[in-house]
Design a protein with these regions (language model features):
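Glycine-rich, anion-gripping cofactor-binding loops and their flanking helix/strand elements
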Residues: 103-184, 282-287
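Phosphate/pyrophosphate-binding active-site segments
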Residues: 176-272
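Short acidic-hydrophobic, aromatic-tinged amphipathic segments that line or gate anion-handling sites
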Residues: 2-11, 141-148, 200-214
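Structural motif
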Residues: 99-101, 159, 263
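Glycine-rich phosphate/diphosphate-binding loops that line cofactor/substrate pockets in enzymes
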Residues: 28-35, 87-100, 118, 254-260
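Conserved thiamine diphosphate
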Residues: 1-37, 227
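Thiamine diphosphate
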Residues: 1, 272-287
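Conformationally flexible catalytic loops at phosphate/diphosphate-handling active centers
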Residues: 22, 31-95
Length: 287
């Protein structure tokens, strides 16, 4: 193809974050690295163009969120080398001793296998999307993440590892948007799957292959409040909607009517959010 990547940037204005611009340009350059060719970048500068002092540009408030990165000789997205077999990250022995959060987005049933037990062994918090097929350790996250005290403690995690993409829960998306620590993405594609444009380490791999290459370290949970809140939510939801006949009640009890070896198709966007917030699906159930 000619060019191998095209980037049509909007007219420059401060509303567009610097990290968005960097990750967008790096994504195009990464495609060029995989397939030699031309990258076309279109920048519609508004006229007239004024002279500017380089010192003023370097100290502009727009660049403040990325000043630390600008002083370091590394890419915004650290793409791990493509290998036939997933290799363990060189610093995994250190990172697995830290406080971590696992977020599981849309995954195939094959890739969903093992994430629950891996996170449980690590003592890390597991946040799951209804599309993940992963049985949550702390269900009803879209509800209990409304607790600002617990959310702030969760944001103190040292590392977040994201499997898959496309999260339905608004509160999980808000958590991801606010997190500022080490961020890893495991997704078997070259597509950009992080709408928040974190500086990150990116693994182009299937989730279960990545888990096999990164053995867990058995340790106690570093944060107990999410488990306590999820148990409270289970009781509260049952009390509020358990005996009623409405959409919320169906969403909460939908796992009771699922056929064995079936596939769940949710076509209404509001009902999808209710199911994501109010129910627990069996491990690996396709949706």
């Amino acid at each position: 193809d000619y060019p191998v990547a095209s980037v049509n940037l909007p007219k420059p204005q401060a509303d567009y974050a610097a990290k968005w611009l960097i990750s967008t340009l790096e994504q195009a350059c990464y495609k060029q690295k995989q397939q030699a060719g031309v990258v076309h970048i279109n920048v519609p500068f508004a006229e007239p163009l004024y002279n500017a002092q380089e010192q003023e540009i370097d100290g502009h408030p727009w660049l403040m969120p990325i000043q630390r990165w600008l002083s370091q000789p590394k890419n915004w997205v650290d793409h791990q080398p493509l290998q036939q077999e997933v290799l363990m990250h060189e610093n995994w022995d250190t990172w697995r001793t830290k406080r971590g959060v696992i977020v599981a987005g849309q995954l195939t049933p094959e890739q969903a296998m093992g994430i629950n037990s891996w996170a449980n062994t690590m003592g890390w918090i597991l946040l799951t999307d209804i599309q993940s097929g992963v049985e949550p350790l702390t269900p009803y996250a879209d509800i209990w993440l409304a607790n600002q005290t617990v959310k702030q403690k969760l944001l103190q995690a040292d590392i977040v590892i994201q499997f898959g993409s496309r999260f339905i829960s608004k509160r999980i998306n808000q958590f991801l948007a606010e997190f500022q620590g080490e961020f890893w993405v495991v997704e078997q594609s070259q597509n950009a799957v992080d709408p928040n444009h974190h500086t990150q380490t990116r693994f182009n791999a299937k989730a279960h292959h990545w888990l096999r290459a990164h053995p867990p370290l058995r340790q106690k949970p570093w944060l107990l409040e999410p488990l306590a809140l999820s148990k409270f939510c289970a009781t509260f939801i049952e009390q509020q909607v358990g005996g009623n006949l409405n959409e919320a009640s169906l969403a909460h009890h939908i796992e009771r009517v699922l056929p064995y070896n079936g596939i769940l198709f949710l076509g209404n966007s509001l009902f999808v959010r209710l199911v994501d917030a109010l129910t627990k699906l069996p491990e690996g159930y396709p949706i």
